[in-house]
Regions:
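An N-terminal-biased, well-structured beta-alpha scaffold segment characteristic
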Residues: 1-65, 69
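Glycine/serine-rich phosphate-binding loop and adjoining beta1-alpha1 elements at the start
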Residues: 38, 42-128
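Residue-level detector of alpha-helix initiation sites
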Residues: 35, 97, 135-136
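Glycine-rich phosphate/diphosphate-binding loop of Rossmann-like nucleotide-binding domains
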Residues: 1-4, 115-206
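Generic hydrophobic/aromatic pocket-lining and core-packing "Φ" positions
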Residues: 6, 41, 63, 103, ...
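A structured beta-alpha segment of the ubiquitous adenosine-cofactor-binding alpha/beta core
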Residues: 11-28, 35-36, 183-213
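Hydrophobic beta-strand scaffold residues
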Residues: 16, 50, 73-74, 152, ...
Length: 215
């Protein structure tokens, strides 16, 4: 729900239609956050265009069926992350929100104080947070947790993320003898079995002193 009222749409010349079936069967272009229900998908006709966030790997069969019916489907999370497409990069914006929300939700369910509190009766230590993965969502989680007074640790297979984590006040956990597992496009690549074992050992030791894990 976008939070816009019907009158706001009417003011810019939009026609309000209450019958969902009419909209789906008559529209040439349909913008939808998630994939339509199975019943509504049956209402679509050839040469219509669907634009939205459709989780194509999960909904592969449904999308293939739409393609067979000559329906165009544009799943925005599959847009290439290139300069020309930056204004339509929904992954970064949604990942930012996901990182922020993960911290807020976890802190709301945490039964202790987040920042360190010093009183005459004693000191309450700050909560320790581990963020696994320092991509867009991870960096936002680190920044949010740090602003709220937590002690933040983070790990990532891409060594270039170390500087980003530390710039936000986080402590970067480095695997001994680690290599930079980053592709030319900035994504993480497959790690060796030896690296994975070292990473597991590092996390196993770290988790013993962590209050909240975000991954």
């Amino acid at each position: 729900h976008l939070g816009f009222k019907d009158n706001e749409y009417k003011e810019v010349g939009v026609e309000i239609c209450k019958n969902e079936a009419d909209i789906l069967s008559k529209a040439d272009i349909i913008v939808q956050l998630g994939l339509l229900s199975d019943d509504n998908l049956l209402l679509l006709k050839a040469k219509q265009t669907l634009v939205g966030v459709f989780n194509p790997y999960i909904n592969k069969e449904k999308i293939e069926n739409l393609s067979k019916k000559n329906i165009n489907v544009f799943s925005l999370e599959m847009l290439p992350r290139i300069t020309r497409a930056q204004s339509m990069d929904i992954l970064s914006s949604q990942a930012n929100l996901a990182g922020y929300k993960a911290v807020i939700e976890s802190f709301a369910n945490f039964e202790k104080a987040i920042p360190m509190m010093m009183t005459a009766a004693g000191t309450i230590p700050a909560a320790k947070v581990l963020v696994v993965g320092a991509g867009v969502a991870g960096l936002q989680a680190i920044a949010t947790a740090k602003r709220m007074g937590a002690i933040v640790f983070a790990t990532d297979v891409r060594m270039t993320s170390k500087e980003q984590v530390e710039s936000l006040g986080g402590k970067f956990l480095t695997v001994e003898g680690s290599e930079n597992l980053e592709t030319e496009g900035g994504y993480a690549k497959e790690a060796s079995a030896e690296f994975k074992k070292k990473q597991e050992d590092l996390l196993s030791e770290t988790l013993k002193k962590i209050d909240i894990v975000i991954c």
